[in-house]
């Protein structure tokens, strides 16, 4: 890592390199990292200008939801269909978002399952560092690959049977509630609201 540029080359064999003058991979958050509710996605997607995620200033990332207002990215607008309460928490610094994979890619999918698994494995230590440092109360997993990864990091108290939609797990001695979901951008509105009601139960405890 140079003095002025944060670089990660762990995935250069898969044509991914993290490079930013503003923040390191473990600093990558949209919103307030000290928020008690986190949404975790798989990886950021590049917008048309190819600079949306990799060149933003650290302050812009921290203030992302306050700065965007009604022009917030469509990815985040989907969460309003899940829960307006959750969506409103973004602007209040009560909810934040990060990804397992910190490098932005041209799409939300990878060229193969092997590449996806390799990239997730390489980037996973950054997420572990984030979770241990900030210790959110609630983690919402956005997508099957995210669910599987989080279950391997935040260990359930007992083996899951595959039907659970949430669990309490731990990493070291820290415990956290984890909500499991398919990719919110692809599930229907009925499933989104069912998910939202479950999330709201935990938010309102």
Model-derived features: positions:
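Short hydrophobic segments within beta-strands
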Residues: 40, 98, 141-142, 181
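Short, solvent-exposed loop/turn segments at secondary-structure junctions
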Residues: 43-47, 101-105, 144-148, 183-187
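Active-site and ligand/interface coordination hotspots across diverse enzymes
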Residues: 1-71, 123-126, 130, 167-172, ...
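A short, flexible N-terminal coil/short beta segment enriched in small residues
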Residues: 62-96
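Charged, often glycine-rich, active-site loop that binds/positions anionic groups
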Residues: 96, 100-123
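Beta-strand-turn-beta hairpins that frame and shape the catalytic cleft
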Residues: 35-37, 87, 92-93, 169-179
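C-terminal capping/extension of enzyme domains
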Residues: 2-16, 113-128, 147-205
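Proline-aspartate-enriched helix->loop->beta-strand connector
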Residues: 127-143
């Amino acid at each position: 890592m140079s003095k002025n540029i944060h670089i990660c080359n762990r995935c250069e064999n898969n044509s991914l390199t993290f490079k930013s003058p503003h923040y390191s991979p473990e600093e990558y958050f949209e919103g307030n990292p000290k928020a008690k509710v986190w949404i975790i996605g798989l990886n950021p997607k590049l917008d048309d200008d190819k600079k949306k995620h990799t060149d933003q200033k650290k302050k812009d990332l921290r203030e992302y939801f306050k700065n965007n207002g009604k022009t917030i990215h469509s990815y985040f607008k989907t969460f309003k269909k899940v829960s307006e309460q959750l969506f409103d928490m973004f602007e209040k610094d009560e909810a934040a978002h990060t990804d397992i994979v910190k490098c932005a890619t041209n799409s939300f999918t990878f060229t193969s399952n092997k590449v996806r698994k390799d990239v997730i494995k390489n980037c996973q230590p950054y997420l572990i560092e984030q979770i241990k440092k900030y210790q959110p109360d609630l983690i919402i997993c956005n997508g099957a690959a995210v669910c599987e990864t989080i279950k391997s990091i935040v260990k359930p108290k007992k083996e899951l049977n595959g039907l659970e939609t949430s669990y309490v797990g731990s990493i070291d001695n820290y415990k956290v509630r984890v909500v499991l979901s398919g990719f919110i951008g692809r599930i229907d509105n009925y499933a989104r609201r069912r998910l939202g009601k479950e999330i709201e139960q935990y938010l309102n405890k």
